[in-house]
């Protein structure tokens, strides 16, 4: 246990080469928080007796009740290494003391935006995988997010005690299970890896994989055992590490190593990993769990484990815990792996700078980030807001990438829409205090140098969710985070007592601050809408809203799904609209955009801010567009970055550039509220074929062009086989074989389609993957548990948009009914308008 003073931590923060910023990421229920606990216990912030059941990182009451992590929390740990260990570190270091900033993030898929926020401020990730369940859908999603942010992973295979006690596996089976898990992690890494990172695959023999049991509090890496044996036998540690994994066998008779699994006489040999590493562990388990009183002391003596007075009387699992903790303490193995294999901010910012910074990669700010320079101008990224203990105020939680942040410093607070030289989304304010985040508590410090994680007090009113803080007006923003989920489920919220309305409005503001991926807005009919990524996420958000942020009783509508409007064919004729003064005409046609192009736009591969030539290159080479069209994209919509495009196909039109701004504004408006039922449009390409304009500038102002362009966009869409797209979840369900029938019946009832079903090798579990429309997903978990007797656990994650088949104008079809209901709710006429409403004859 280390007694910490804030001064000591502050001293460590200056040695940036000895700082490690890392997050713990994994599938839900694979044991992140439990592992984090054993690390925290080592750093002396939680008492040794409580670790394992304290779940220190889960700071909220609902987290402790549900047993899941909802928000990501941060904590600083202290690790000291021996000189031998420090020699093995492949990057520059300074002394033996290390500061590890650990962020425990949620595994449940509805909260993956929290994970994104945590990843942005860290350089390394501890990926936790369950031995028995293996790599799941969420493991893959989170790992993909991490690699996209250029974050280096190391792996912990957790819950080894389950394999030993529940499944009673043999040594070779266990080795094969480990090998399979490592392989499936490496497949994901090599698929999504950024070449700049180099080879970041994980190898047990290099010490980048640890094997652990979070509940029992023990863990080991191959390197630790190699250390023990190299001292005992006097062999080289590096060589020993190579031999303790993979196909290498030790022949005890000849005392020679071989890579064949039989000796000269054809007797089978035991794999080195099994013999030198698993054997002592298996023997301890067997002796203790079978209560062999005489064997235990002999084994303990061999392994040099000493029990204290009252520990000698323990037996069974309690004794096992104590012994394993002494034999292989979890914190030692994990801290050693973190310090040895994860990059320091100095190392990491060198290759992460260009993915973090929006401006040119050779300006002084990007250079300062690349060098992690504490004396440069301040560059700090706030990735999220953390509510303080007194209601209503927030800490801004972020990381200093360059410069030093001080209490009382005057800074520029730049929101996500800020552009250099403009005034919007910019505040000049001073930071009241800088604080260290320590799980449940905060500690005040005076300043914080580059490379460290920090909380700021007093700027929460000026930032919505995330943003950049600088001291120089020439600095660009840090890039906005890309979330892998989108809010597709929404509810309307109203107060039970009309006097409470102001509290609700204030509460909604706070809610959208405290969660990076919730949307709150007011609809045209005056309802307050809250949108979330899924049922659980919404439930938690509304619970927060009612209890904390607004603090008043609420009435909540049934959940509604957001749809997208699209077209399925080309307009059957050219649409034409005239301006209100009849002097200007616009002729356009609409056509669908390929799904791949839409996805590229949504994932930021094709970006409205890119150079138009580079963008045209991608569209022409990858998606087969005509180069001339690809260069003449006027804008993306809605919000300037959505998956709908205006393409200028006119020939020799006078004054065309003067109306470009008006056309763009009108298109943003038209795609934000489409013609079918006022939802966002998706995958619609509008080609402007011809424009006739009045010669006199005063007769072709915005007031003439904007309504015309909007009407003609609507007309062209209604002529092009209008349709609606619904969001679809990818469901992954793990269950025993006898529950599969129940799963299929529930999925069929809910318009789900199964895409794969496979058995996990070495376990009785099956993994079923299916697509399930979000519209049908409400109450899905409950029905599934009923149908399978509680044996199936679904994971829902937003996957794609899918066109609903059927005519939107026919109210007896499925999409027609949805459209009609939505139009009535929004107070529009129940019928979808005819194109003639927007189309003008010559």
UniProtKB/Swiss-Prot annotation:
Keyword Nucleotide-binding: yes
Source taxon at top rank: Eukaryota
SMART domains: EFG_C, EFG_IV
Every tr-type G domain range: 17-346
Catalytic activity: GTP + H2O = GDP + phosphate + H(+)
InterPro entries named among the record's database cross-references: EFG_II, EFG_III/V, EFG_V-like, EFTu-like_2, G_TR_CS, P-loop_NTPase, Ribosomal_Su5_D2-typ_SF, Ribsml_uS5_D2-typ_fold_subgr
Entry EC number(s): 3.6.5.-
Positions of modified residues (Diphthamide): 699
Any Gene Ontology CC annotation: cell surface
Gene3D superfamilies according to UniProt: 3.30.230.10, 3.30.70.240, Elongation Factor G (Translational Gtpase), domain 3, P-loop containing nucleotide triphosphate hydrolases, Translation factors
GO molecular function: GTP binding; GTPase activity; ribosome binding; translation elongation factor activity
Residues that coordinate or bind GTP: 26-33, 158-161, 213-215
Keywords: Cytoplasm, Elongation factor, GTP-binding, Hydrolase, Nucleotide-binding, Protein biosynthesis
Annotated localization: Cytoplasm
GO process terms (BP): translational elongation
Additional note from the record: Has antigenic properties.
Family under the similarity heading: Belongs to the TRAFAC class translation factor GTPase superfamily. Classic translation factor GTPase family. EF-G/EF-2 subfamily.
Function statement: Catalyzes the GTP-dependent ribosomal translocation step during translation elongation. During this step, the ribosome changes from the pre-translocational (PRE) to the post-translocational (POST) state as the newly formed A-site-bound peptidyl-tRNA and P-site-bound deacylated tRNA move to the P and E sites, respectively. Catalyzes the coordinated movement of the two tRNA molecules, the mRNA and conformational changes in the ribosome.
Name of the protein: Elongation factor 2
Organism this protein belongs to: Candida albicans (strain SC5314 / ATCC MYA-2876) (Yeast)
Lineage: Eukaryota, Fungi, Dikarya, Ascomycota, Saccharomycotina
Name of the encoding gene: EFT2
């Amino acid at each position: 246990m280390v007694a910490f003073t804030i001064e000591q931590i502050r001293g460590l923060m200056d040695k940036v080469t000895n700082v490690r910023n890392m997050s713990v990421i994994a599938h839900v229920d694979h044991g992140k928080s439990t592992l984090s606990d054993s690390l925290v216990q080592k750093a002396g912030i939680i008492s040794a007796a409580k670790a394992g059941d304290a779940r220190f990182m889960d700071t909220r009451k609902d987290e402790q009740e549900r047993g899941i992590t909802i928000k990501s929390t941060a904590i600083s740990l202290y690790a000291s290494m021996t000189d031998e260990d420090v020699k093995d570190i492949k990057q520059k270091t300074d002394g033996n003391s290390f500061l590890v900033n650990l962020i425990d993030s949620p595994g449940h898929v509805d909260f993956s935006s929290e994970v994104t926020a945590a990843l942005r401020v860290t350089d390394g990730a501890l990926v936790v995988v369950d031995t028995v369940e293996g790599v799941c859908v969420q493991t893959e999603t989170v790992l993909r997010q991490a690699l996209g942010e250029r974050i280096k992973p190391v792996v912990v295979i957790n819950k080894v005690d389950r394999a030993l006690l529940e499944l009673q596996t043999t040594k070779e089976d266990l080795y094969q299970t480990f090998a399979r898990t490592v392989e499936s992690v490496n497949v994901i890494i090599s698929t999504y890896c950024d070449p700049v990172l180099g080879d970041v695959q994980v190898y047990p023999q290099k010490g980048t994989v640890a094997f652990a049991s979070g509940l029992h509090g023990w863990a080991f890496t191959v390197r630790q055992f190699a250390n023990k044996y190299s001292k005992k036998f006097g062999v080289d540690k590096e060589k020993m590490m190579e031999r303790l994994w993979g196909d290498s066998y030790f022949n005890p008779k000849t005392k020679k190593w071989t890579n064949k699994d039989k000796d000269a006489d054809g007797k089978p040999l035991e794999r080195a990993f099994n013999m030198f590493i698993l054997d002592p562990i298996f023997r301890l388990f067997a002796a203790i769990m079978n209560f062999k009183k005489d064997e235990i002391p002999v084994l303990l003596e061999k392994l040099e484990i000493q029990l204290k007075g009252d520990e000698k009387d323990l037996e069974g699992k309690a004794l096992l815990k104590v012994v394993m903790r002494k034999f292989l303490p979890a914190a030692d193995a994990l801290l050693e792996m973190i310090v040895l294999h994860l990059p320091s901010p100095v190392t990491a910012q060198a290759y992460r700078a260009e993915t973090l910074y929006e401006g040119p990669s050779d300006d002084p700010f990007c250079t300062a980030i690349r060098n992690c320079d504490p004396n440069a101008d301040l560059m700090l990224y706030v990735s999220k807001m953390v509510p303080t203990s007194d209601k209503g105020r927030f800490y801004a939680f972020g990381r200093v990438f360059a410069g030093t942040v001080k209490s009382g410093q005057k800074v520029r607070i730049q929101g996500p829409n800020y552009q250099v030289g403009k005034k919007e989304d910019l505040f000049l304010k001073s930071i009241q205090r800088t604080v260290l985040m320590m799980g449940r508590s905060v500690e005040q410090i005076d300043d914080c140098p580059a490379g460290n994680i920090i909380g700021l007090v007093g700027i929460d009113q000026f930032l919505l969710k995330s943003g950049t803080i600088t001291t120089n007006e020439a600095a660009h923003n840090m890039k906005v985070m890309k979330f892998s989920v989108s809010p597709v489920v929404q509810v309307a919220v109203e107060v039970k007592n009309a006097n409470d309305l102001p509290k609700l409005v204030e509460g909604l503001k706070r809610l959208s601050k405290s969660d990076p991926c919730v949307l709150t807005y007011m609809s045209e009919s005056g309802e307050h809408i809250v949108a979330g990524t899924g049922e659980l996420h919404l439930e938690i958000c509304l619970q927060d809203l009612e209890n904390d942020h607004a603090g008043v009783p609420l009435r909540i509508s049934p959940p509604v799904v957001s749809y997208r409007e699209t077209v399925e064919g080309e307009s059957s004729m050219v649409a034409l609209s005239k301006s209100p003064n009849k002097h200007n005409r616009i002729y356009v046609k609409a056509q669908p955009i390929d799904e791949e192009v839409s996805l590229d736009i949504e994932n930021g591969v094709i970006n409205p801010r890119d150079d138009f030539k580079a963008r045209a290159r991608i569209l022409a080479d990858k998606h087969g567009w005509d180069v001339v069209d690809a260069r003449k994209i006027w804008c993306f919509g809605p919000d300037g970055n959505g998956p709908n495009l205006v393409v200028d196909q006119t020939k020799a039109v006078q004054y065309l550039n003067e109306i470009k701004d008006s056309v763009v504004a009108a298109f943003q408006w038209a795609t934000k509220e489409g013609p079918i039922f006022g939802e966002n449009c998706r995958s619609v390409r509008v080609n402007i074929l011809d424009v006739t304009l009045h010669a006199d500038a005063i007769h072709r102002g915005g007031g003439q062009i904007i309504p015309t362009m909007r009407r003609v966009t609507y007309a062209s869409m209604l002529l092009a086989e209008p349709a609606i797209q619904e969001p679809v979840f990818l469901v992954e369900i793990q269950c025993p074989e006898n529950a599969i029938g129940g799963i299929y019946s529930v999925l069929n009832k809910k318009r789900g389609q199964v895409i794969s079903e496979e058995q996990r090798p070495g376990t009785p579990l099956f993994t079923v993957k299916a697509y399930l429309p979000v519209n049908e997903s409400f109450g899905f978990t409950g029905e599934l548990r009923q149908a399978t007797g509680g044996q199936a656990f679904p994971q829902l994650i937003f996957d794609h948009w899918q066109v609903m088949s059927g005519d939107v104008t026919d109210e007896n079809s499925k999409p027609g009914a949805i459209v009609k209901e939505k139009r009535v709710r929004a107070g529009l006429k129940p019928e979808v308008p005819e194109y003639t409403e927007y189309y003008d004859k010559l």
